[in-house]
Amino acid sequence: MRIHYLLFAVLFLFLMPVPGEGGIINTIQRYFCRVRGGRCAALTCLPRETQIGRCSVKGRKCCRTRK
């Protein structure tokens, strides 16, 4: 029965995100950006766009054209 605790701890360590890289979080944020009709911009939004959110932990912006 103790082996289950060890396996759980090892599995937990492998699933923890590396600091600075939120793999699962970034994927979810990109998905919701696209659902809201936006796109992920690396640095800034284009002049005819407005920022509606973020696409990653590192600062990519979710931009959508102004209505």
From Swiss-Prot:
Biological process annotations from GO: calcium-mediated signaling; cell chemotaxis; defense response to fungus; defense response to Gram-negative bacterium; defense response to Gram-positive bacterium; killing by host of symbiont cells; positive regulation of flagellated sperm motility involved in capacitation
Presence of the UniProt keyword GTP-binding in the record: no
GO CC annotations, alphabetized: extracellular space; membrane; microvesicle; sperm midpiece
GO molecular function, one term: CCR6 chemokine receptor binding
Cross-referenced InterPro entries: Defensin_beta-like
Entry-linked Gene3D superfamilies: Antimicrobial Peptide, Beta-defensin 2, Chain A
Subcellular location(s) of the protein: Secreted; Membrane
Domain of life: Eukaryota
Family named by the database record: Belongs to the beta-defensin family.
Description of how the protein assembles with itself and partners: Monomer. Homodimer.
Designated name of the protein: Beta-defensin 1
Gene field: DEFB1
